[in-house]
């Protein structure tokens, strides 16, 4: 879940429990020789202003833009943090999951898209963003800025099974599951 707004907390008596950090990495096909991008270049590519890989030191070939669906948390972080709420070109191909994004980029040598850091594997190549490697360590330290906190939200103070579940999420076992899922556990704050 997302961070609660003050209005929601006041109106519904909600409480937030941050439990993990999620990072977003820009990715290309492993055959693409481009391995770095700046925030401005990302904004220009996704806005349709840069349309050829040659502008980034790559091949003289058109860039194919991939994005996530409206409502995707990954897209929300990407648009807010990487694009600074800038536009995404209307011709962008829309995919509905991190897995679908990896498949699309893995099959398109001219594609660029983004996935959660925990989903980066050999099927895609993650780009450094403003000279920072998109790693779990850099996301946890705050050095890599394309991140967001994930929250558990409850109405009022948690009790019973809800409290037990939240305690479990913060336990070593819960932290291991969070890591295995590709996120970075925050521990109890």
Q: What feature does the model see in each segment?
A:
Residues 1-189:
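Exported/periplasmic ABC-transporter solute-binding proteins
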